[in-house]
């Protein structure tokens, strides 16, 4: 019975994909969203079938400086919200060695509001801009397997530049380049105590933004989760976090701040709820991460609210 419950709970956990968040790289920003890879039991394969998911991602932060639209911006304050709608399909025994395979498609609508200062030959000027539009879509594929008491998952996410982008705008929902993220997740879950430990390292590669001649560097990220599951009560709680580091320099004529390598560390609480009224078909995840350490990036807080329904 407990394994059945776990199978229903994890139906949302393979659905969490990164969207446009503000980090290092161009405008100190990246496709990687902290806390998106390791939530609750990320390595455990979900049941076969189709799942619809809605994710709401929040970020509010500040940075001393970054480059946007070919100009150096200082004293930056940004507020970001994304509403991501997606669908996944899970095949229990795929042709890939008989292991569970999942694919998914996600399309976001985002709102970005930025305030900053720009220096010109005529002095410094305060700027502000906001926009709401379609964001960059995500395609993903995940392969699950188990060895002993450890569950594993490898995921490849492709970020497609379908979002709105204008070079000289201060705020853009789209990023105008492709991103490729490979993540490997591991989960240990003790079914008697309900204690879970998960780890999810990953690496992100970016193509060049041809409009600004800005090549964002390669990004390494690792996420961790220590969770406690209460199977009979239909919920779980956890302490979760992330470490992020840019491992290669930004480049191109648009990289006016040089290498601009960024790094960050954050941690915070999370809760998973599978309401009994949903008969195991509905799962809700809420999460809030506090940015504790940062360099060359917007620093602030990250929020997630995810609702999924298995058809």
Which residues make up each language-model segment?
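Detector for outer-membrane/organellar transmembrane beta-barrel domains
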Residues: 151-157, 164-251, 273
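Residues on the lipid-exposed face of transmembrane beta-strands in outer-membrane beta-barrel proteins
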Residues: 42, 54, 85-91, 138-145, ...
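Surface-exposed strand-loop-strand hairpins of Gram-negative outer-membrane beta-barrel proteins
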Residues: 25-31, 58-82, 118-130
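Outer membrane beta-barrel transmembrane domains
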Residues: 28, 32, 210-311
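Transmembrane beta-barrel strands of outer-membrane/channel proteins
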Residues: 52-60, 103-109, 154-160, 199-205, ...
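Residues that define the transmembrane beta-barrel architecture of outer-membrane proteins
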Residues: 77-85, 99, 128-137, 174-180, ...
């Amino acid at each position: 019975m407990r394994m059945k419950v776990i199978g229903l709970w994890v139906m949302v956990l393979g659905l969490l994909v990164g969207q446009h968040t503000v980090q290092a790289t161009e405008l100190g920003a990246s496709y990687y969203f902290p806390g998106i890879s390791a939530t609750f039991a990320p390595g455990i394969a979900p049941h076969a079938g189709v799942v619809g998911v809605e994710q709401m991602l929040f970020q509010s932060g500040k940075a001393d400086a970054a480059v946007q639209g070919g100009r150096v911006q200082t004293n930056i304050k940004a507020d970001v919200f994304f509403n991501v709608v997606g669908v996944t399909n899970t095949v229990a025994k795929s042709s890939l060695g008989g292991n569970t395979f999942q694919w998914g498609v996600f399309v976001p609508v985002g709102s970005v509001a930025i305030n900053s200062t720009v220096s010109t030959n005529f002095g410094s000027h305060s700027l502000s801009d906001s926009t709401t539009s379609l964001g960059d879509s995500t395609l993903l594929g995940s392969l699950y397997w188990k060895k002993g008491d450890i569950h594993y998952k490898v995921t490849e996410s492709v970020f497609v530049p379908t979002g709105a982008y204008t070079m000289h705008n201060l705020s853009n929902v789209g990023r105008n380049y492709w991103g490729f993220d490979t993540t490997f997740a591991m989960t240990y879950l003790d079914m008697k105590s309900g204690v879970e430990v998960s780890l999810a390292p990953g690496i992100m590669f970016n193509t060049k933004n041809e409009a600004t001649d800005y090549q964002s560097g390669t990004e390494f990220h690792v996420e961790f989760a220590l969770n406690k599951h209460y199977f009979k009560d239909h919920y779980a709680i956890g302490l979760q976090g992330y470490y992020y580091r840019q491992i290669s320099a930004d480049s191109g004529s648009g990289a006016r701040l040089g290498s601009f390598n960024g790094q960050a560390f954050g941690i915070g609480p999370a809760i998973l709820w599978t309401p009994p009224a949903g008969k195991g078909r509905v799962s809700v995840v809420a999460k809030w991460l506090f940015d504790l350490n940062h360099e060359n990036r917007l620093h602030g807080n990250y929020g997630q609210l995810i609702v999924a329904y298995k058809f």
